[in-house]
Amino acid sequence: KQKNVAPILLYAKGNTDLLNQKSVAIIGSRTPTIEGEKAATYFSKEFASNGFNIVSGLALGCDALAHQSALKANGATTAILAHGLDVSIYPKENKDLAKSIVENNGLLISEYGFGTPCTSYQLVERDRLQSGMSTATVLIQSKINGGSMHAVNFALYNQRLLYAVNYKANLVDVSVIQENIHLLEGRN
């Protein structure tokens, strides 16, 4: 069963005004195809350029591309962390990106107190916040049962707008966009 529970407390580092800005969650595979990378970059830049705060989970792949693209567009971005703010950034490959987000008027937030390390359960809970604090969620690319499906399911459960990128079948291996196809065909 999905949870529709707002966090009791949020820990924040950076521009907390972004919590009141219209936001779009950009989510997807940690290993997107070239077409997935292009889509993540395009949609993040477009939304950021039009005044939306880009929300994602600072994971490798689509999440990192979403944050980077928002910054390149001089837009706003919020990274939701699955650990305390004082703990080493997960994944460690995105430590510099997290620093850049804060330095460029962005925001890092977590519902976990200081000293709390990242766990797989908390990664799922992070996905709940991504869809929960966003007007809409955009699925860039996901296999069936990919990690992005947590955010998709939370968006559906909480009746948020949900979009999936539609790819030309000859450009992308169908196995890496199966969840996109399901959503586009009207899965509910």
Predicted regions: what they are:
Residues 1-188:
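Glycine-biased, small-residue-rich flexible motifs in mid-sequence functional cores and linkers
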